[in-house]
Amino acid sequence: MKNKMWKLLGAALLLMPLAACEQNEAQITAQGEQAELVTAYLDAVDERYAYEIAETLAYDPAYLSNELGFRTAGSDAEHAAARYIADEMEEIGLEVEQVPVTVDRWQFNDASLRLEGTDIDIMPASYATNGTDEDGITAELVDVGSGGAADYAGKDVEGKIVLAGVDQWNEAWIDQYLHEAELHGAAAIITYDTGGYATYSDEMINMQDVCAEDVMPCVSISASQYRQLAEAIEAGNDMATLIVDNEMQEEQGTSYNVVGRLKGRSDEQQIIVSGHYDVYFNGFQDDSCAVGLVLAMAKGMVDSGYQPENDILFIAHGAEEWGASGTQFDWTTGAWEMINNAHPEWAGKTIAMINFELPAFYDGMSQGQISCVPEFSTLTKTFVETSGLLAEPVDAIYPEGISAESVDTNTMEDGVSYRASGVPYFINIPGTQEGEKGWIQQRYHTVADDRDTYSAQVMQTNLNTFGALAIYLDQTPALALDLNATCDDLQEALDTTLAGENAQPYLDALDALRNAAQAHQEEIAAINAQYQDALDEKADQQTLDEIRERGRALNVKTLDAFRFVQEQFIGIISTSDIVIKHVAYQNNVDVIEGVIAALEEGVLSNEEGSGALDLAWMINGGAEYGYYSFSTETNAASLATLQEESNPGNLFWGTDKGSVLAQTYPATVSLLEKAESEDGDFTEEIAVYAKEQAQQERYLQEMIRQETDAMQELTQMLGA
């Protein structure tokens, strides 16, 4: 998992969930055949088994690459872990396959940093970049402060090792620090966190995906280790030897997605239950606990004697954290390869994916949450409020129960790759609180993601909740994927003022689509109601099978429509914000208008945050912010890996999701310079912004027209 914000409890509360749930005493209120199936599963599922799997994956040295941990894309440790997971799946009784997919291989074996004249000997953590030879790099260590362009002024770093403080939460991702060091001729870069991540303590080393070309060794140390180095440099001991034993092989690695199949009565459809098993450090929560949960759910179903209607595939994906060099879309590579190259046919037959990330820590939330694509929000509400299949959270760990209001998914886990190919999905949510006291900023991708964070109650609650959800999905013949939610998103996304004369055709097409979506939803509901009536009347198996066959036929249309929605309407701003495609242009037009208005008033910055430089950073989804601290060359290098024009065939799940960026950066850079010189003439900058705003308006109108045409086509698809 890449980056999301969650809240952590204090240490005392964290200790409470360590005790295992003595027995799963979960109860449900529903009656009937589905209820009996869920009850049998709840009686059989074993939280302790999930913990044992997670602990083994996180701490057994046989499945780790070095003393810091690490199990990365295509590494020996990842291969060993795949075999272990496959063996466990076979022991459970699943049909097992290790599916090979191509990734960039990265194996981090070891690293050391020594300073001459001192006893400093540090083991840094390496990013997914090239290493050194066995002798390493011996060079002067130069402190470049916060690692921005201005920090290199007056410093000769040619052929030297630079030391930079980074904040990847608030300021910039590691690729910009890396490219800035490359621009100035450094031989390697050592980073430490000054804020954002790794706030648990100054002893924490943080690791992230690199989102860049492999240009030089890049490693991370802790803030306390930095202070040792800074004191040594101040004392005149600045000659360092950095050795990084990394094995990097672009497009020559193999990662294994381990699949355990629980065969259904029909193999025409399937459900996927998944987590990923590659890790930074020990990765206890992220994502060893998820693999434990996936296997425990499988074992619970098998042990309960559950016979699914559809195949249920339990999958441990590799190469989620990182799997490809030279792209901003370098995570969830194993999953992307799976659904696009290894098994593209899954896109038309997978009725749902249930993915897991960090599923066993207590976040302090009063209410548990389920995240899903918007089209599953109605199903989630029904499952929580009226199905009677949902057990209460274990030991009231979430005192207000599970929320019926779902949360939209994001791009930070394997579901994004499957969604882009037309697979709708769910994912657990540990919580959504933000801030430096939150779990993500404190422990995420550090050694503090450890077993001390384990909550048996949360693990058991997730096993109960999502196991019941999987059975509910499996037992329901017509997939209740509600395209009314698509219509809601399309309506909410449109600024009718900016859309101008294209607004009414868009809204007319949307009205027609909403009518078709509602009719489709009613057809789904009718089949499911007929099936429930047949169950209540104890109908024979032939009657039930005939209804299920009608449901499967309708599901084909439903999944085709969902895939069409992903292809035609869903865009991604930068790599993080999932939006309706025209919103990228709409936002730019709006922001640039504000920048121009501020410049016409002569205001660069003010307390209200409405000055030109207070706003300009938001252009292109925040990509413009890079110019505030880094050189134009560094920003160009980062953006080159983001866009299809400059990086064709290497955007993975970002393919066809981006937009044409506004070329406003010359004006923004000029404003930053004038802010220092107090030059108040902004005529040239206004001209640049106005030109780019007009271009973004043209792109906006064209995209709105395309979406209007697509709505009409989707209406016809649903009516066929």
Give names to the regions the model predicted.
Residues 17-20:
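C-terminal motif of bacterial Sec signal peptides marking the signal peptidase cleavage site
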Residues 22-24:
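Bacterial signal peptide processing site
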Residues 36, 119-154, 207-284, 295-307:
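Soluble metallo-hydrolase cores and metallopeptidase-like ectodomains found primarily
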Residues 48, 52-55, 59-161, 168:
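Noncatalytic luminal/extracellular "stalk/propeptide" segments of secretory-pathway proteins
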Residues 125-217, 401-404:
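Extracellular/luminal Protease-associated
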Residues 169-176, 257, 279-375:
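Acidic/histidine-rich catalytic neighborhood of metal-dependent amide-processing enzymes
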Residues 359-488, 567:
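Active-site-adjacent substrate-binding region
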Residues 464, 474-720:
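C-terminal non-catalytic alpha-helical accessory regions
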